UniProtKB/Swiss-Prot annotation:
This is Probable RNA-binding protein 19. Gene3D superfamilies: 3.30.70.330. Expressed in the crypts of Lieberkuhn of the intestine and in intestinal neoplasia (at protein level). Keywords: Chromosome, Cytoplasm, Developmental protein, Isopeptide bond, Nucleus, Phosphoprotein, Repeat, RNA-binding, Ubl conjugation. It holds the Pfam family RRM_1. PROSITE patterns: RRM. Residues 273-286 have a biased composition (Basic and acidic residues). One of its GO terms (cellular component) is chromosome. Disulfide bonds: none annotated.
Length: 960
């Protein structure tokens, strides 16, 4: 665990000081102090280190030590969801809600209040019949509640009798249209009208107030009925969404209406405004500012306009909200704000400018009073809705996509660290770790794609919440982006050429189409013409002596040799290019198919657009180059964008270089600067441009270096052959092993005598499926002498309390399973004959002779033909030199990258025993059955086998 929790920190602790205390013990990846929501320090913090060793040192040093006057406690953190994690006891931690049981003796304050009210009500009931108490109440009541002409004496009984006739007398004069429309639903209207106190009954109203109340009610009732009917029609068209927005736009009005609903029923109509008029006057306060940036303003609207008229005016558009502006008196001002959902609807609404609505032309323009945050509209998504997918993203289940999004990564981590962490769960197909373009440091999140989705599910369940280099990882399922190549290939209208380019670009990272030192024939011809001060037409002149194809092939061979010499001088290991299945680099790119005369500055400009470059190696002639990036992410971006893209007039062929392509770490900028920018002028001064008939003085060291490298390769090949070959007498059979002895312990004992090639203990499964040792095993050495030495020295040696019984094993060692996947080791040179494969069918034997005769005198050139003996050859041939030295020189020159008629020649050393008579004998044995043996011969062979087995058993008994 590389993450620590530090408890009981002093109150004055700052993050800078906290970081400085622990920075002396290693690289910090996280440093945080914890505070409450109010900003109060909780006296603990977290520290993350890059490695566990650094965290252990810091924990050992600071645990139970003092900072100022506080004794701190330093402990290792637990992973999220760890069952051994201690339970939080702080008051700030979330605790499960448990209902509190009230004590038995205690009573709630609500019960006490109810008891007090009941007691007061009981006392008032007793005093109702008391006349003196009623007189006391009438005297002490408020003057506003009693008429000035009323009698001060107690006159309760007459008032009760007079109230009914008065109301009955004035009931006929009441207007049925003035009945209140705000009574509860389900009650009879006639009963409400008879029970409701009318304006004429209220004595405190004057005649003028009574008339005013009649006028306001009539106007408001008619207008409210019209608006309600229009609103109902609009709401039916818009749906429930508009209702929710209208209700949310005026929450203050709803509160005021709900509070004053009960008060307005008993209040005079003239003293208080109707709710409709009050709502209209209060609307502008909330609707001066547009709610979104997609708002248009309508000016010059009729004063009797409704939302239905606005909807008809803007049809077929469907506005999100319509706000009709009113002044303080509730009158419409002719301005209307209309909100739309996107910018396209706004542009269509602006086309309605100066069109007519109700006999008046309307001006439509964009609202200028828009919030400062221009661009996208407000994010109306809720937290529970999750992230909205982008245009090029599609949602897919983790069990199908196999792609993870990892965040809270340390800024000091690398792609290798992430690959090591996640490759434990399965093979990875892609790892995308974004970096900052300025600082070149990671952004703290990455995308991991597994080859098999079930491995991604396993990694998601185990890695989420784990501590990685001092920080707690957060892993989420990721979305998948649609690849542009698939879209391009799916279009039916695209031409075949575009489809082919998209397919080549998609397969650019595949290793099946890579050729390390590939050179285009057109670029080869240009380079040859520049080298020998000739024209391109002279290079392709078919009337001159010799074949044009052979001439281009020899020119390519010479250029390849110069490129190899240049790469060796610049610290490039050519041995890495010969390994086809080698691991590929993530930062070094081989750039091929460049036009002749390409400059290093042009490559720097092309590739430097995608990131920082390290070394750019461009040999003379400018046909093949090596470009090194400093960051893997930038290298992948350049590879993805530039593969098969047009450079000048030819497509670029890119290939990832093998790992270890540079033998030296420091870049040699001098070589890059010395690269000739004008090869035509500087060719005579360069040693590489010497014609074929002359040999420069500086060429010997390079030849010696090539010979040394070839000698090293031969030694390595011999060692590999020795490892693969199992000589007799190298394997020991060991008995009487302890069942607890492991293969590592046995190998450690026998490796003291010599180099152990393999060590195995025979095991079998029990009923539970557990492998158990059988008490014997085998140890194989590289040489028989080492096995004999171990037999003498370790006979009877005690291992885990058991004396070993050692003897030479006669069984043939079974090859390991991994040997079948090893690369084929090329044959050694035993003769002067070379087997040439992949010969183009249009090539003739004279062209093969012309090509190979450049390196020495030939003995024979044979191209086997088909079975019929007529027509073309079979695509391979044999070239036999007079001497082995000439054959070796030709093999080393032509085996790298020599193309004849566009096909690369593949060279191998022919078998010395393969002759014409041997081939005929082998073919006859394949098609004809061997002659039957006589019975006597078969019996003799059986007797010989039995005698041999008896002698072997006797020797074994003597040894025991």
């Amino acid at each position: 665990m590389s993450r620590l929790i530090v408890k009981n920190l002093p109150n004055g602790m700052k993050e800078e000081r906290f970081r400085q205390l622990f920075a002396a013990f290693g690289t910090l990846t996280d440093c945080s102090l914890k505070f409450t929501k109010d900003g109060k320090f909780r006296k603990f913090g977290f520290i993350g280190f890059k490695s566990e060793e650094e965290a252990q040192k810091a924990q050992k040093h600071f645990n139970k030590s003092f900072i100022d006057t506080s004794r701190i406690t330093v402990e290792f953190c637990k992973s999220f969801g760890d069952p051994a994690k201690p339970r939080a006891w702080s008051k700030h931690a979330q605790k499960p809600s448990q209902p509190k049981q009230p004590p038995k003796d205690s009573t709630t304050p609500e019960i006490k209040k109810d008891e007090k009210k009941k007691k007061v009500a009981g006392q008032l009931e007793k005093l109702k019949e008391d006349t003196e108490f009623q007189e006391f109440l009438s005297v002490h009541q408020r003057r506003a509640q009693a008429a000035t002409w009323a009698n001060d004496g107690l006159d309760a009984e007459p008032s009760k009798g007079k109230s009914k006739p008065a109301s009955d007398y004035l009931n006929f004069d009441s207007d049925s249209g003035q009945e209140s429309e705000e009574e509860g639903a389900g009650e009879d209207l006639e009963e409400e009208a008879s029970l409701e106190p009318k304006a004429a009954v209220q004595k405190e109203l004057s005649d003028m107030d009574y008339l005013k109340s009649k006028m306001v009610k009539a106007g408001s009732s008619s207008s409210s009925e019209e608006e309600e009917s229009e609103d109902e029609a609009v709401h039916c068209d818009e749906g429930s969404e508009a209702e929710e927005e209208d209700s949310s736009a005026t929450p203050v009005l709803q509160e005021r209406d709900s509070k004053g609903a009960g008060q307005e029923q008993g209040m005079p109509a003239g003293k208080k405004r109707p709710p409709e008029a009050r709502a209209e006057t209060e609307k502008p306060a909330n609707q001066k500012e547009p709610t979104t940036c997609h708002t248009v303003k309508l000016r010059g609207a009729p004063f009797n306009v409704t939302e239905k008229n606005v909807m008809e005016f803007l049809a077929p558009l469907k506005p999100v909200a319509i706000r009709i502006v009113r002044n303080a008196h509730g009158n419409k001002t002719g301005y209307i704000f209309v909100d739309f959902s996107n910018e396209e609807e706004v542009k269509q609404a602006l086309k309605c400018n100066r069109e007519y609505m109700g006999g008046r032309y309307i001006e439509v323009f964009r609202e200028k009073n828009v919030p400062t945050t221009k661009g996208a509209p407000k994010n109306t998504t809720k937290s529970w809705q999750g992230r909205i997918l982008g245009e090029n993203e599609e949602e897919e289940d983790l069990a199908e996509s196999g792609r993870l999004f990892v965040r809270n990564l340390p800024y000091t981590s690398t792609e290798e660290d992430l690959e090591k962490l996640f490759s434990k769960y399965g093979p990875l197909s892609e790892l995308h770790y974004p970096i900052d373009s300025l600082t070149k440091k990671p952004k703290g999140f990455a995308f991991i794609t597994f080859m098999f989705p079930e491995h991604a599910v396993k990694a998601y369940s185990e890695v989420d919440g784990q501590v990685f280099q001092g920080r707690m990882l957060h892993v989420l399922p990721s979305t998948i982006k649609k690849e542009a190549s698939e879209d391009a290939s799916a279009l039916g209208s695209s031409s075949y050429k575009k489809k082919k380019e998209a397919q080549d670009k998609a397969n650019s990272a595949s290793s099946h189409n890579w050729n390390t030192l590939f050179m285009g024939p057109n670029a080869v011809a240009d380079a040859i013409a520049q080298k020998y001060n000739a024209t391109k037409s002279q290079v392709f002149d078919h009337e001159t002596k010799g074949s044009v194809a052979v001439r281009v092939a020899l020119g390519e061979t010479q250029l390849v040799q110069e490129v190899r010499r240049f790469l060796i001088d610049n610290g490039v290991s050519l041995d890495s290019f010969s390994q086809a299945a080698a691991e590929r680099s993530k930062t070094v790119i081989l750039v091929k198919n460049l036009p002749a005369g390409t400059l290093a500055a042009q490559l720097q400009e092309t590739f430097g657009h995608f990131g920082s470059l390290g070394r750019v190696l461009l040999p003379e002639g400018g046909i093949t180059a090596i470009v090194e990036f400093l960051e893997p992410l930038e290298a992948r971006k350049a590879f993805r964008h530039l593969a098969y893209s047009k450079f000048h007039h030819v497509p670029l062929y890119l290939e990832w270089a093998p790992v270890g392509v540079f033998s030296s770490t420091a870049p040699q900028k001098k070589k890059l600067q010395d690269t000739p920018s004008e090869p035509m002028e500087k060719d005579p001064a360069e040693p590489e441009t010497v014609p074929d008939g002359e040999t420069p003085e500086d060429e010997n060291p390079t030849e010696e270096g090539a010979d040394n490298s070839s000698a090293k390769m031969e030694e390595e090949e011999e060692e590999e052959e020795e490892e693969e070959e199992s000589l007799p007498g190298c394997t020991l059979f060991i008995k009487n092993l302890n069942f607890d002895t492991t293969e590592e312990k046995l190998k450690e004992v026998f490796s003291k005598v010599g180099t152990v090639k393999s060590c195995s203990i025979s095991k079998k499964k029990n009923k539970a499926g557990v492998l158990l040792s059988m008490g014997f095993g085998f140890v194989e050495y590289r040489k028989p002498e080492q096995a004999q030495k171990a037999l003498k020295q370790l006979q009877g040696h005690v291992v885990d309390g058991h004396k070993l019984e050692v003897r030479i094993s006669e069984r043939a060692t079974k090859p390991a399973v991994t040997l079948a996947r090893k690369k084929q080791v090329p044959r050694k040179q035993t003769t002067s004959k070379i087997l040439v494969r992949n010969i183009p069918f249009q090539a003739h034997s004279r062209e093969i002779r012309e090509l190979f005769s450049t390196f020495g005198e030939l003995k024979t050139v044979r191209l086997p033909k088909k079975m019929t003996g007529t027509g073309t050859h079979r695509g391979f041939g044999f070239v036999d030199f007079l001497t082995k030295q000439d054959a070796k020189r030709a093999f080393n020159a032509l085996c790298h990258s020599t193309h004849l008629y566009g096909r690369r020649l593949v060279l191998e050393w022919a078998d010395s025993e393969v002759t014409l008579q041997a081939l005929r004998r082998k073919t006859a044995a394949h098609f004809h059955e061997p002659p039957k043996k006589k019975r006597s011969v078969v019996l003799d062979e059986i007797l010989e086998q039995l005698e041999g087995s008896d002698s072997d058993s006797e020797e074994q008994t003597l040894q025991l």
